[in-house]
Amino acid sequence: MERDLISVESRDLNEAELGYRTEPFVKMQPAFKDYLWGGTKLKEHYGKHCDYDSIAESWELSAHEAGQSIVASGRYKGRLFADNLSKIGRENCGWKCQSIERFPILVKLIDAKENLSVQVHPDDDYALSRENEYGKNEMWYVLEHEEGAGIKCGF
């Protein structure tokens, strides 16, 4: 459905209503994580630049308190992604975002040079009560892998 798309143009808004000019697409500066298992492929193959020697994760689109993306182009360049959402309003982020306080999706690139630890992710109720964050439902799209690599889930 078209209304599921994230766009600042999801309804007929104009500058007079909003008090500012909308831009349909903006570039984001990711937040980087340098966990022990990270590698150098995000730098070497994907052009990610940061001060870390290795990058485990590049949080491409994040309103998470532990690492927010920064708007890297357009009128709101330099603003935190979450602050930008506050300015354009949740109503412009799709109808499913109306009942939440924060943007619920975290898009990241991962370079797992070493094995990761076992990951156990709580549901929303548990995570909100313990860490004031949403739970982690995940979807993975593997861009490339080494011979013999694998993912185990659901055990």
Identify the residue ranges that each predicted region occupies.
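Transition-metal
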Residues: M1-G154
